[in-house]
Amino acid sequence: QVFDQACKGIYDRAIFKKLDRVCEDCYNLYRKPYVATTCRQNCYANSVFRQCLDDLLLIDVVDEYISGVQTV
């Protein structure tokens, strides 16, 4: 399930899938279970999610992802 019921913002399946994909890709990069779970904490508003964006070389679109985090 992509949608986190703890998130209080706008429910947008496309945004959740996009944010969740970052955590999945980051998990695949490091193969550490805590990466995937920590990345999703606090509706993606955390330092691990931000680090994953950097590690996945998504630096040029960070603002787009941060905007998504603020939406959900």
From Swiss-Prot:
Record carries keyword Transcription: no
Cellular component GO terms, alphabetical: extracellular region
Positions of post-translational Pyrrolidone carboxylic acid modification: Q1
Covalent S-S links between cysteines: C7-C43, C23-C39, C26-C52
GO molecular function, one term: neuropeptide hormone activity
Cellular compartments annotated: Secreted
Biological processes, Gene Ontology terms: circadian rhythm; glucose metabolic process; neuropeptide signaling pathway
UniProt cross-references to SUPFAM superfamilies, sorted A to Z: Crustacean CHH/MIH/GIH neurohormone
Residues bearing PTM Valine amide: V72
Tissue occurrence: Produced by the medulla terminalis X-organ in the eyestalks and transported to the sinus gland where they are stored and released.
Residues the record lists as D-phenylalanine modifications: F3
Pfam families the record matches: Crust_neurohorm
PTMs per UniProt: Stereoinversion of L-Phe (in CHH-I) to D-Phe (in CHH-II) the two forms are present in a ratio 3:1 (CHH-I/CHH-II).
Keyword Secreted: yes
Main location as per UniProt: secreted
Keyword annotations: Amidation, Carbohydrate metabolism, D-amino acid, Disulfide bond, Glucose metabolism, Hormone, Neuropeptide, Pyrrolidone carboxylic acid, Secreted
Protein purpose: Hormone found in the sinus gland of isopods and decapods which controls the blood sugar level. Has a secretagogue action over the amylase released from the midgut gland. May act as a stress hormone and may be involved in the control of molting and reproduction.
Family: Belongs to the arthropod CHH/MIH/GIH/VIH hormone family.
Protein name per Swiss-Prot or TrEMBL: Crustacean hyperglycemic hormone
